Amino acid sequence: MARQPRLDAPGALHHIIGRGIERTNIFRTDQDRDDFLNRLANQCLEKNIVVYAWSLLSNHFHLLVRTGRYPLSEVMKKLLTGYVVNFNLRHKRTGHLFQNRYKSIICEDDPYLLELTRYIHLNPLRAGLVGSLKELGYYRWSGHSAIM
């Protein structure tokens, strides 16, 4: 059965989730995380997208983005393909890294935007990567620390 095409429109708000195959780590080192975030920042500039929230955990990531004039699929293809190529070179491996294709859910601006931003930014706390909200304020791999 063929996959349904993704819903997208210029200016759409998307909650994006990407997971490692069999929940394996897609971020092994800080260099991996830095590479992913640098690539995301480049896509923001090149493709005119806005990132409202992001969180990188060891085996998955969450993004909350508003697309610009380019389709989300074009943005994510460049982000994820470039990331996987470098990840595989760094870690001397081959093959796929992500489980299936990324999940994207179109969201309404109000009232869901604020709630979803909170959900994404609190993910490291719920996962036990940090022990408190105060520690989350210093956690480099979530947008929470960038806006606090």
Region locations from a protein language model:
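Short catalytic/metal-binding and nucleic-acid-binding patches
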Residues: 1-148
